[in-house]
Amino acid sequence: MRHRLSGRQLGRNSSHRKAMFRNMSASLVEHELIKTTLPKAKELRRVIEPLITLAKVDSVANRRLANARLQSKSAVGKLFSELGKRYATRPGGYVRILKCGFRAGDKAPMAYVELVDRPARAVETAVEVDAE
């Protein structure tokens, strides 16, 4: 019976699913924007939001918990040094999921997963400086 079971299996066994979300979480922390299928994006939100909440309090114990879930030193470092401070006053909702059409090969619904309040890329603009 299927009582009170939450989460999607995504056609993978548990270890594959765990490794996939570990890799996707580390990529999202490092790049702040990734493209994936819509069901994976919705499940990734359940993984990454508690990690960002954990990063609001920078302690050795919290860093060890985050490292156990991400297993990427650079991602854990960025999580606590940048993202924890960026979202210190936000009470949740750190991830935005934007639908972006369907994949060409199998028509799977695709989505962008991005961190909200991420800094926009610096666009090179020609600014004239008045020389006096």
Curated annotation (Swiss-Prot):
Lineage of origin: Bacteria, Pseudomonadati, Pseudomonadota, Gammaproteobacteria, Cellvibrionales
The protein, known as: Large ribosomal subunit protein bL17
Family matches, as Pfam families: Ribosomal_L17
Membrane-traversing stretches: none
Gene Ontology process terms (BP): translation
Record-level GO cellular component terms: cytosolic large ribosomal subunit
Keywords, alphabetical: Ribonucleoprotein, Ribosomal protein
Alphabetical list of PANTHER family matching this protein: LARGE RIBOSOMAL SUBUNIT PROTEIN BL17M, RIBOSOMAL PROTEIN L17
Source domain of life: Bacteria
Family to which this protein belongs: Belongs to the bacterial ribosomal protein bL17 family.
Assembly: Part of the 50S ribosomal subunit. Contacts protein L32.
Organism of this sequence: Cellvibrio japonicus (strain Ueda107) (Pseudomonas fluorescens subsp. cellulosa)
GO MF: structural constituent of ribosome
